[in-house]
Design a protein with these regions (language model features):
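Active-site core of metal-dependent hydrolases
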Residues: 174-265
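N-terminal hydrophobic targeting/anchoring segments and the immediately downstream early-domain regions
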Residues: 4-5, 11-167, 171-176, 233-243, ...
């Protein structure tokens, strides 16, 4: 499939208005629950009752298993190794198939409609890092075929730091970042993923690697979860040229819930989240805007235990944050003061975002796209 270059127009004149910073329960939205809800990144919940409570019809489901590895510069990388991930995807597949009354293993976009019509949830298996297939670089990337056969439908090139395929967003040499490109092996991987109809995810990639991937891929690509660098100048946030390049492939950009990458203000609000969605729409067009979580369905677990006390909850991130500050990685010089937007660290977040979009002046048609139809379109274009 050829990239859909310049097929979107920038949206203009979004209606003005502020989103309420405090959102209570939303029973009024129950009658509007027919809107398709698709999330860009979440996990299989411990309690499957969370699926129905979330109102989500489908989501990219990270089934990664990781090994923590210390880097030579003292930071920690979390590698998705072949052995760990082949076990985790096998276990996830067994669990999904054993709970077919609640779950559908998403293999193509038609499974989204099947899930919605039967009050189930379609999960599309994703792995956050192509480290799991590095062992087959010299063997035609045959490990990609193994994972595809077990249900893998989206593969992220890397996670934070570069690997044999791609530069990572946090690669550094104490001078502010390396911005390493897609490698020759990375180009081969993109072609392999295109051939296997597996969605290419550039979340956590360096800007240059993301741009290279947009150029090389024959199918739409996505950043399933991320934020906007024009709003928060941080290495984990994407510059406008990356957002535009992703959109020009026919892909999309999902904005996630990690509030220290959504605002440097002391108190994170729903308005901050909506501002990122607006910016993606202005840069890439409304067809490129999507929702992502990157926490469990119920929300960030530790913050929920703390009743969303950000001052306490952020402490678990400080050691990691400070280690990257010492390496002069972009954005880590600013001390984080929060982890979540309390109103959205809730299992009802999709309804709350939908209402917030309405209050911000987004039309019903645009909300349809942002809340789920854009994901459905991209998965239809890529998966068979």
């Amino acid at each position: 499939m050829q990239p859909l270059i310049n097929r979107r127009q920038l949206i203009k004149g979004l209606a003005a208005g502020t989103v309420l910073s405090q959102l209570g329960p939303l029973p009024a939205l129950a009658s509007e629950n027919k809107r398709l809800f698709v999330d860009g990144l979440c996990f299989l919940p411990d309690d499957l009752a969370d699926l129905g409570a979330s109102g989500i019809d489908a989501y990219l489901c990270d089934i990664s298993a990781i090994e923590a590895m210390k880097q030579t510069d003292g930071t920690t990388n979390y590698k998705r190794t072949y052995q760990a991930c082949i076990k985790s995807i096998s276990a996830a597949k067994i669990r999904v198939e054993a709970n077919s009354d609640k779950l559908i293993l998403g293999l193509n976009a038609n499974d989204i409609n099947r899930a919605k019509q039967s009050d189930r949830t379609a999960v599309f298996f994703q792995i956050q890092g192509a480290d799991c297939v590095e062992g087959s670089i010299n063997n035609g990337l045959s490990q990609v075929d193994e994972f595809h056969a077990k249900g893998l439908r989206a593969l992220q090139l890397t996670h934070h730091y570069g690997n044999q395929f791609s530069g990572g967003a946090l690669d550094n040499d104490a001078s502010g970042g390396l911005n390493l490109p897609l490698t020759q092996a990375g180009e081969a991987l993109i072609n392999k993923l295109n051939d296997n109809h597996i969605l290419v995810d550039v979340s956590h990639s360096s800007p240059q690697a993301a741009l290279d991937t947009a150029r090389v891929s024959r199918s739409p690509i996505v950043q399933s979860h991320g934020a906007v660098r024009a709003l928060v100048n941080h290495a984990r946030c994407s510059p406008d040229e990356v957002i535009k390049a992703i959109a020009d492939t026919g892909g999309l950009f999902g904005v996630f819930m990690m509030s220290f990458w959504l605002t440097n203000d002391k108190v994170p609000t729903v308005d901050h989240y909506i501002n990122h969605l607006k910016h993606v729409a202005n840069v890439g067009g409304i067809d490129a805007v999507a929702i992502a979580n990157d926490y469990p369905l119920r929300g960030q677990k530790n913050l929920l235990k703390l009743n969303n006390n950000n001052a306490e909850g952020v402490k678990q991130y400080l050691s990691w944050w400070h280690s990257l500050r010492e390496k002069n990685v972009l954005g880590y010089d600013i001390e984080p003061e929060h982890v979540v937007i309390p109103e959205l660290n809730d299992i009802d977040r999709m309804n709350r975002i939908d209402l917030a979009l309405s209050k911000a002046g987004f039309s019903s048609n645009d909300r349809d796209k942002i809340m789920g139809q854009n994901w459905q379109r991209v998965l239809s274009d890529v998966l068979v």
